[in-house]
Amino acid sequence: MDYWWSESGLRFECAACGRCCGGSPGVVWTTPAERANIAKELGIDAMAFREKYMVRLEGKCSLIELENYDCIFLERNSARCKIYKVRPLQCRLFPFWPSLLTDQNGWNYYANFCQGMNQGKLYLPEILNKFLNLPAARYL
């Protein structure tokens, strides 16, 4: 299938601004393996992790948002993630989510908030297709 980026690719370079992690409503879906890794990183058991950091939405588990819509693991002052080493796939793939790679309007909408989109490193179509076809990515 051809997308608007099929010939030229897309540019992205993380600006470490934290905008992808807060400031507007959203969800961060997690798998059982991701939850186990995060709990281990935090030094707590899986049950304590679920009770303190998770919410169930649409039959799936998402990280909790704070009242200002920041991810519970975003350190707002430094714009850094407290669980960066073990962050969920959804966070690792941003902005290369299927929902954004298949919708130019969606990509452009997020680019209004993310300083790194359409800037920096060029991701060739071959790489973008790999992101799009990751088995786990279809759940994002």
Residue ranges and their predicted role:
Residues M1-L140:
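Short loop/turn segments that flank or connect secondary-structure elements
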